[in-house]
């Protein structure tokens, strides 16, 4: 009976995907002659779908920022030389998607449309304006250039047109009209034999979230988004894919290891867990059917913790009470956290030991197998921890990946000890004080005072120009 109820609730689901002083920003050119069907302003759909819109808007209540680097300064060392060592906050409400990508230190402080450290692709999961630009310019046109180029055009937060074909008759009639608004996501699903247009309703519900909640990388000269699923979705499959094309996101500034940075692989880890294997979708747990004041059922678009809507989520399938299930989840979360910290400790030592080996005169040939072990260890660790909900989605897979990461890190440190001995170094390599985020950032040479000052200037001068330009072009409501 519970399963029938769940299926009935699923049928009506409407879903969204569950992750800057001068006048140099010229007037944007008018929309091209291509057919454009994406409406990016979410408030356009409020009269037609008031309950869904108001619940989506309520994601602004999820406003707390949690500083992951302050909580765990080891991360600064693991990401030395990469923008994540500057700033990494845990996710919050979809209503902050554009704000957060503007404000993070990772995107730098560009002064012109051609300035800054990151490519246009960094907007890809932040706004329905991305789908609009892809329709107007094509994928090659959208991905071309620096992140700052998109500032005056990508201004609306994640919303309706990211997940729904809002121009369709079905949507006008109140049906979900789910769609993959990113062509690269559609190609990725085809690579794992899941073409969207042939998928069932439940599969589509999770695939729409999987447009953004996935591992991806920036491919080619244009730095276009691609999912590394050609060999499969398991951590070893993606590792094999990246190794075959000799891809790295960056080189760790301490160990000189060509590194991989996992993003937010919820779709992959969910697929590996008990819920994914039984096709209990993202929607079932994070966007349940609820009743409005008149008793009408609608899909709650305030995406959040299933325990906040226990009766409408977990209780549809589970007979245990809320406290019992919370205890199980908390135990799994703690087990993953404990192993995560142990792996990080080994990796921190490995990066500093590798630096010591280089400083002692180690050759590329001597270091190659060691760096490969560090690369693989940190990749497996990162894929396990970058999905913040893995303790719920796939705890067994999380522990398996972390165990494998521990083995690889141990292999690297064993080889490093032997190599260092040949260089006359037999003592333990000391670590600097990395007990706080600030001390760890100082240890890798970051000038955080300058970085923060540049960012604040950018936010005060460039971002207001972006928003003014967007209003002039009717991309934002006045």
Curated annotation (Swiss-Prot):
Substrate binds at residues 216, 264. Its EC number is 1.7.2.2. Its cofactor is Ca(2+); heme c. Gene3D superfamilies: Butyryl-CoA Dehydrogenase, subunit A, domain 3, Flavocytochrome C3, Chain A. It is an enzyme of class 1 (oxidoreductase). It catalyses: 6 Fe(III)-[cytochrome c] + NH4(+) + 2 H2O = 6 Fe(II)-[cytochrome c] + nitrite + 8 H(+). Pathway: Nitrogen metabolism; nitrate reduction (assimilation). One of its GO terms (cellular component) is outer membrane-bounded periplasmic space. CDD domains: NrfA-like (cd00548). PROSITE patterns: MULTIHEME_CYTC. Pfam families: Cytochrom_C552. Ca(2+) binds at residues 215-216, 261, 263. Heme c 3 binds at residues 94, 209, 212-213. Keywords: Calcium, Electron transport, Heme, Iron, Metal-binding, Oxidoreductase, Periplasm, Signal, Transport. Heme c 5 binds at residues 275, 314, 317-318. Residues 1-26 form the signal peptide. Heme binds at residues 122, 125-126. GO terms for biological process: anaerobic electron transport chain; nitrate assimilation. Catalyzes the reduction of nitrite to ammonia, consuming six electrons in the process. This is Cytochrome c-552. It comes from Salmonella paratyphi A (strain AKU_12601). The lineage of its organism: Bacteria, Pseudomonadati, Pseudomonadota, Gammaproteobacteria, Enterobacterales. The gene is nrfA.
């Amino acid at each position: 009976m519970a399963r029938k109820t769940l299926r009935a609730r699923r049928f009506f689901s409407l879903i969204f995907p569950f992750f800057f002083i001068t006048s140099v920003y010229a007037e944007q050119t008018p929309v091209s002659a291509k057919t454009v069907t994406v409406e990016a302003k979410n408030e356009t759909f409020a009269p037609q779908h008031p309950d869904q819109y108001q619940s989506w808007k309520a994601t602004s209540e999820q406003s707390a920022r949690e500083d992951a680097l302050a909580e765990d300064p080891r991360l600064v060392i693991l990401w030395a030389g990469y923008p994540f060592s500057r700033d990494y906050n845990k996710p919050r409400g979809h209503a902050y998607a554009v704000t957060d990508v503007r404000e993070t230190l990772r995107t730098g402080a560009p002064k012109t449309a051609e300035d800054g450290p990151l490519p246009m692709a960094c907007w890809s999961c932040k706004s329905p304006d991305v789908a609009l630009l892809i329709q107007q310019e094509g994928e090659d046109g959208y991905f071309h250039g620096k992140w700052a180029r998109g500032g005056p055009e990508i201004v609306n937060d994640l919303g309706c047109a990211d997940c729904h074909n809002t121009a369709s008759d079905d949507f006008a009639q109140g049906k979900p009209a789910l769609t993959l608004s990113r062509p690269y996501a559609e190609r990725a699903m085809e690579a794992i034999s899941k073409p969207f247009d042939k998928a069932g309703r439940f599969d589509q519900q999770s695939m729409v979230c999987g447009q953004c909640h996935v591992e991806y990388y920036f491919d080619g000269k244009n730095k276009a988004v691609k999912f590394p699923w050609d060999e499969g979705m398991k951590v070893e499959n993606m590792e094999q894919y990246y190794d075959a094309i000799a891809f790295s996101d960056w080189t760790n500034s301490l160990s000189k290891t060509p590194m991989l940075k996992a993003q937010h692989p919820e779709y992959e880890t969910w697929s590996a867990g008990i819920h994914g294997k039984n096709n209990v979708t993202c929607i079932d747990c994070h966007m349940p059917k609820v009743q409005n004041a008149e008793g009408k059922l609608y899909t709650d678009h305030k995406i959040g913790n299933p325990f906040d809507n226990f009766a409408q989520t977990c209780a549809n399938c589970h007979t245990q009470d809320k406290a019992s299930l919370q205890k199980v989840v908390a135990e799994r979360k703690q087990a993953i956290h404990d192993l995560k910290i142990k792996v990080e400790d080994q990796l921190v030592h490995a990066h500093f030991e590798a630096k010591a080996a280089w400083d002692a005169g180690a050759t590329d040939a001597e270091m190659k197998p060691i760096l490969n072990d560090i690369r693989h260890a940190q990749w497996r660790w990162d894929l396990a921890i970058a999905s913040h909900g893995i303790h719920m989605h796939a705890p067994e897979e999380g522990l398996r990946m972390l165990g494998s990461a521990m083995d690889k890190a141990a292999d690297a440190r064993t080889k490093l000890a032997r190599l260092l001995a040949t260089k006359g170094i037999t003592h333990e390599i000391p670590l600097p004080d990395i007990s706080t985020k600030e001390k760890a950032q100082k240890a890798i040479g970051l000038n955080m005072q300058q970085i923060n000052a540049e960012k604040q200037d950018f936010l005060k001068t460039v971002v207001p120009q972006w928003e003014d330009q967007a209003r002039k072009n009717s991309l934002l409501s006045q």
